[in-house]
Amino acid sequence: MEEFQGYLELDRSRXHYLLYPLLFREYIYALAHDHGLNRSMLFENAXDDXKSSSIIVKRLITRMYQQNPLIFSAKDSIQNQFFGHNKNLYSQILSEGFAVIVEXPISLRFLFSLERKEIAKSYNLRSIHSIFSFLEDKFTHLDYVSDVLIPYHIHLEILXQTLRYWVKDASSLHLLRFFLHDYWNSFITPKKHITFFLKGNPRLFLFLYNSHICEYEYIFPFLRNQSSHLRSTSSGIFXERIYFYVKIEHFVKVFFDNNFQCILWFLKDPFMHYVRYQAKFXVASKDTPLLMNKWKCYLVNLWQYHFSVWFQPGRIDINQLCKYSIYFLGYRSSVRLNSSVVRSQMLENLXLINNAMKKFETIVPIIPLIGSLYKSNFCNTFGHPISQPTRTHSSDSDIIDRFLRICRNLSHYHSGSSKKKSLYRVKYILRLSCVKTLARKHKRTVRTFVKRLGSEFLEEFLTEEEVVLSLIFPRTYSTSRRLYRGQIWXLDITSINDLANYE
């Protein structure tokens, strides 16, 4: 990585980066996969012992420019071994290289802007669970929420124009545009092709999508500061996660050139809160639905006139928080009213006082989670555990370690659930699926294999939180009930579990 950064430092004096030559450096693809140069996960199923080298990249670029993707047919793909059978494989290599190369100048520019403006990094924002602590603190005092799916560009050139601000190298942009045009049909063809494109090119797609989302989020801190004239509590989050200060002067010019200052009075709301993960965001407010409708109209006009994205206003619903649940990051979150009756007596008069308190609840939706287990072949459609024949060739320790790791990761991620009974069912499915896989490997019945393993095997499926807490606190009934059933937000989770990502 030092060599990569040193290469970019050589060209910083010219105020742009020459990224095109980096496509022919082998260490770029080693960085992309976190593997050595002699081994790559891309070629596990390949018939030949190929390596990601500059020769392969040169061949791919040459064939891409020679072929016309608009007249490329299925018959040609069968006849052309390189651009047919190996097209997806080589394109996956190139997409990984693109992702690493294009990410680097943006990261360096962001770090340079932090050093210049002396903005301190907020390391506590790296955990996904910090979002739920924010929701617990803020959403219990709010009344209305809009849960919105972010629209995506309908034309590729709009996305390419967005990238021109970040990447100044014309050669890299031209090749990237050509590469995207070759695969753009995957977005307008059936769903299976889209799924293949996303799975085959995850890093490049995430970078392109996040660059698209950042264009929306630039505007929110600026609008909030301009409209409410109060210090924005969320500006520090945006300043770290996106590059707000880089484009603030540009957006000031855009808004005042287009007479946007005349509608800023609609948005004077110091209680507006915004949170986003992946392709969904929620906007919540304490005021009346009238203000939420004004925000709704503004967002639709912003997407249509400034980002050329068509979006139907009817798809943005305004709901009361006390009557609505938000499906967010593998949780079903809601604000519930808990009533508590207090008995008060003064002299001979007896009064009952009913106190209503808001509580932020996070529940694990068991049906989608079991659906994820079904897709991963841990159970059938009814939730009954099944064995995994593909794992029978592994050793017993590897099979047990894999199931334990999945079980602990799921339990660790969903430790903030206010109702953990559904997690016990997930543990049961994973535990019995592990036993059935081992019994199938040794050609024995499940009953005899469980007797052979004993109760010690079942105790291994305790979560890490239960093991640590059992060593610190006594296992009394009151302590166990308070600790194991309470919400535990772990601030070391940087990515959502694959099984929990069923949205």
Swiss-Prot record:
<keyword id="KW-0694">RNA-binding</keyword>
<comment type="function">
    <text>Usually encoded in the trnK tRNA gene intron. Probably assists in splicing its own and other chloroplast group II introns.</text>
</comment>
<keyword id="KW-0507">mRNA processing</keyword>
<keyword id="KW-0934">Plastid</keyword>
<dbReference type="Pfam" id="PF01348">
    <property type="entry name" value="Intron_maturas2"/>
</dbReference>
<dbReference type="InterPro" id="IPR002866">
    <property type="entry name" value="Maturase_MatK"/>
</dbReference>
<dbReference type="InterPro" id="IPR024942">
    <property type="entry name" value="Maturase_MatK_N"/>
</dbReference>
<keyword id="KW-0150">Chloroplast</keyword>
<dbReference type="Pfam" id="PF01824">
    <property type="entry name" value="MatK_N"/>
</dbReference>
<dbReference type="InterPro" id="IPR024937">
    <property type="entry name" value="Domain_X"/>
</dbReference>
<dbReference type="GO" id="GO:0003723">
    <property type="term" value="F:RNA binding"/>
</dbReference>
<dbReference type="GO" id="GO:0009507">
    <property type="term" value="C:chloroplast"/>
</dbReference>
<dbReference type="GO" id="GO:0008033">
    <property type="term" value="P:tRNA processing"/>
</dbReference>
<protein>
    <recommendedName>
        <fullName>Maturase K</fullName>
    </recommendedName>
</protein>
<keyword id="KW-0819">tRNA processing</keyword>
<dbReference type="GO" id="GO:0008380">
    <property type="term" value="P:RNA splicing"/>
</dbReference>
<comment type="similarity">
    <text>Belongs to the intron maturase 2 family. MatK subfamily.</text>
</comment>
<dbReference type="GO" id="GO:0006397">
    <property type="term" value="P:mRNA processing"/>
</dbReference>
